[in-house]
From Swiss-Prot:
This is PGR5-like protein 1A, chloroplastic. One of its GO terms (cellular component) is chloroplast. Disulfide bonds; Cys-300 and Cys-303 are probably involved in the formation of disulfide bridges with 'Cys-11' and 'Cys-105' of PGR5 while Cys-272 and Cys-275 are probably involved in the binding of a Fe-containing cofactor (FCC). Residues 61-198, 258-324 are stromal. Inhibited by antimycin A. Induction: Up-regulated by drought stress. Belongs to the PGR5 family. It comes from Arabidopsis thaliana (Mouse-ear cress). It is found in: Plastid, Chloroplast thylakoid membrane.
Amino acid sequence: MGSKMLFSLTSPRLFSAVSRKPSSSFSPSPPSPSSRTQWTQLSPGKSISLRRRVFLLPAKATTEQSGPVGGDNVDSNVLPYCSINKAEKKTIGEMEQEFLQALQSFYYDGKAIMSNEEFDNLKEELMWEGSSVVMLSSDEQRFLEASMAYVSGNPILNDEEYDKLKLKLKIDGSDIVSEGPRCSLRSKKVYSDLAVDYFKMLLLNVPATVVALGLFFFLDDITGFEITYIMELPEPYSFIFTWFAAVPVIVYLALSITKLIIKDFLILKGPCPNCGTENTSFFGTILSISSGGKTNTVKCTNCGTAMVYDSGSRLITLPEGSQA
């Protein structure tokens, strides 16, 4: 409609018709909203009348055009490993299990259950999904493979090797071996895992750090602020002295003072098997006063349940005769 109207405006016949009938003194009143006639001014004193036409599309045509557009399904899977059919798309857990099965079959059975391209696509998909399985260390992957092999009835490690590997991962602070409160039907005990509280262990060095800073500034004072003068030298000399001389000396003094007062210290935390409240226990020696060896008895701050913290096995157990 717009193209036809533009053609009629630029037609020479229309301009000739307008030039024959000038309307210099004619000033029409503004049309009402209900009027179908629109006045268009071409030049001063010249105006023409255009007839407005309204085209109504049938409702059936509009619904037919909008229907297929709204019903399109866009699959977000871009890798060859993924299935286009959403009903067959595997979950992250299924892909992780297949990844571990491929590793186990290749390293322990000597058989490849998938090609190198399929394995790379699976690994890339897991990394894209944010899975932590592909970022595990060799010991963590071995532990997961041993767990899956034991469940399937084909163990690759004996009980002693499995327990040693699990304890090693606990000491290293791995998250895949940490479990919540659980009950053992064989020993009829309630267990919970312990983890290292690195933040509180770091706070133990704060008093010694303050003392080391005091000694550093005292040495600067008795030397006539020679250390401050060196730290104010132009770059890069001040940067080198600060970060490669002053800071290492302060850190070394702080750690030495801490180890002189507190020896073989370890802070462990874990949830209460009864209520789940996190409790902390200290292991070590403060000024020749021992905390009690490798086991401590701790009372829950919430429910008052007595618990036994074992730093050797990194487990929380309830004493004999107690009820969870």
